[in-house]
């Protein structure tokens, strides 16, 4: 039975320096991580800090599987304003360089802005801007030997539904671009029952978190209302060969957070085992 690698996003410690949490993450049994780019955690503008983070990751024998690109109100690669768009691309490319310096292989990006209620008349223009911006970013990632991965966003935002993700994927010239399925986002959009099948040919990664259906709680899988067995059955049926990254909140102390991550990892493996046993 193929075991999906299950790692942990350091985003659960986004308010804590990466230098102050990695040893605890490793001690909890996680040797594969996604790196959070929140400035208080790891400032990708500070290349001395980036280099030191890479050294520590290697010392701890951790696999830096992925790096989450920065996202904030001031970063908008779809903006009608070319100055804002250029600045946003520059920030993301800088983060991609930081990821490459650390030895990361996958660079996860929210392809749209972190703003809701954008004027409908701007939609097509913004979609075209996103395609042009992502083409530039994909080229930079290819030169850095890092794979660009697009994440489905929350339903009230651009690229919050599979149709938008598939459109932008088709508009990107590079064929070496994948998709990261965020289960929490897909559950809130109502797309989770069908999204695995729709995106299956392009799925490289899976951000796993749970919620109670009304907000993006980032609970450990199994702690919310998501029905995980159908999701895992679809992933297994379609021979998903990527990696699962637990993207849970850090609202508790480090010990409680890591206990939740360990419990979630066991939960996913137990569900997968039941699914595969039922097919024998």
Residue ranges and their predicted role:
Residues 1-104, 135, 201, 262-280:
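N-terminal pre-domain/capping segments
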Residues 46-52, 85, 92, 123-134, ...:
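Charged helix-capping and loop-helix junction motifs
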